[in-house]
Amino acid sequence: MTSQSTPRIVVIGAGIAGLAAGAALSHAGLPVTVLESHIYPGGCAASFRYQGHWYDAGATLVAGLAPGGPLQLLGRTAGIESWPARLCDPTMVVHLEDGTIVPRYADERRWETYRSLFPTSLPFWTWQEKTARLLWDFALRLPELRPRSLGSLRDLVAATARWFLAAHPSPAIVLDLWRPLARYLPDDPIFRRFIDAQLLIAAQGVATDIFALYGAAALDLPNAGVAEIAGGTGTIARLLVEAIQRQGGSVHFRQEVETIERAGTSWRIRTRQGLVLESSLLIANLTPWGLARIWPEAPKWLRSRTERPPRGWGAFMLYVSLDSSAIPPGTPVHQQILAPGQLGEGRSVFLSLSPEWDGSRAPAGRRAATMSTHTRYEHWWRLAETDRTAYEAEIARYTERMLDTAARALPWLPGAIRAVLPSTSLAFQRFARRPWGWVGGFPQRHPFVGWPTEIVPGLYLVGDSVFPGQSIPATALAGLRVARRILRELGADLVLAPQEPSVHLPAGEGEPVMAYR
């Protein structure tokens, strides 16, 4: 397809952040065009079809649906009236290698769990919940932590002042911007192992690495309205696509952006498929490294910072078809299982099942499961480029290790497996266009680890590379922050629906995921 038009705003990438920005801007009346290289929206939070199953590609835990939460704010700004979902209870279950089982509840039962399993941890959880509320309150004000213009600096100062006046945080909270979360943990090795495992999936590091303020908020995700979404996590992206289209915007799939360049006061965007667009504003739902690859005229500072691959993690995935009759009724959909040894590399596994009630996710008699483990992406590229036989053997070894780890806590699992599709970091580069298959954003070691949102005037970066970092609710806030910034520069603001979206399931089976082609 070859055509030329001049939309005001172009969004590169239909990940959650890009779609959040596009939907909010469309709802406010601005013309938006989204370009996505794949056939499915959502990026790492997409769902894809394989052999009759709908698998969640990467991110499998949807949080932020509690009243006043990030996804409720997103729904209001996008004009979404309801989320087809059911809240998880418990939100997840963590299985430690010593046999300790820790259910994560969002209600008062969580305190019963803490008292029973980790009695010395109660002061920590009191601090954690209070601190998490403060940070989420701040994040929901959509501040820009890395201002590069007078306008964004002014917004940051105003948001911080309003936050201090409303929340009354202790001045000591400033210290938690730099000291690690481990400082607050009791001297209980089993509890510390549990916290490290939870932080790894929520903040990309362990308690000795993650700064305390962020760690407190990351540990709060199970309390923030975790839900089973009809059709899988990709439904969030699908509803955002529909919101953009409903307001007159457009979303083009199978359009991979090849280059961007300045054209006077506008941006010219070219895709591999021959589409050429011009826009006055550009939103890149990419990693900084992905942006550098399509921008030959990128500033020297950006090129310098992207010369080396990013620090962080890749993911090794298993997409598993399960015999539903072999799964015990009532099994929680989210499970984290640990084996002895260093976390990651198949010794810590996060498993998410399609809900029992959602018949759209798999053929009759089956259920879809996504399993993931943190892995060093460099390892997979080295093998793939030097020894393909060793690469395939390593895939088999990791597959066996992950299944063995999961079976430690879920003895029914081996007998339920009917098919397994493994995936390495190479797949995340191929399908999600994440250079090197780097996923999850930066390990949150300090508050300025992320990139600035405004790269140059008229070009904004959104996604897990900017504050507040990884997760579906965090990237949604990153997108909304850019949308609000653009609207305020035009003398407008986000348009909020008077009520939050409802959270309920439609009548009948789960709503099917749609593929956009």
Regions found by a protein language model. Give the residues of each.
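A glycine-rich dinucleotide-binding beta-alpha-beta segment and adjacent secondary-structure elements
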Residues: F191-G205, F350, R408-P468
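A conserved beta-strand/loop element that lines the FAD pocket in flavoprotein oxidoreductases
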Residues: I244-V257
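Active-site/ligand-binding neighborhood in enzyme catalytic cores
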Residues: E129-Q247, F431-P443
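Mid-domain catalytic core of redox enzymes
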Residues: E256-A364, S502-H504
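Active-site-proximal substrate-binding core of FAD-dependent oxidoreductases
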Residues: R262, L487-R517
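N-terminal glycine-rich phosphate/pyrophosphate-binding loop and immediately adjacent elements
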Residues: Q4-R146, P443
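C-terminal segments that line or cap access tunnels to active or ligand-binding sites in enzymes
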Residues: D323-L426
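A conserved FAD-binding loop/helix module that cradles the flavin
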Residues: A59, D464-L487
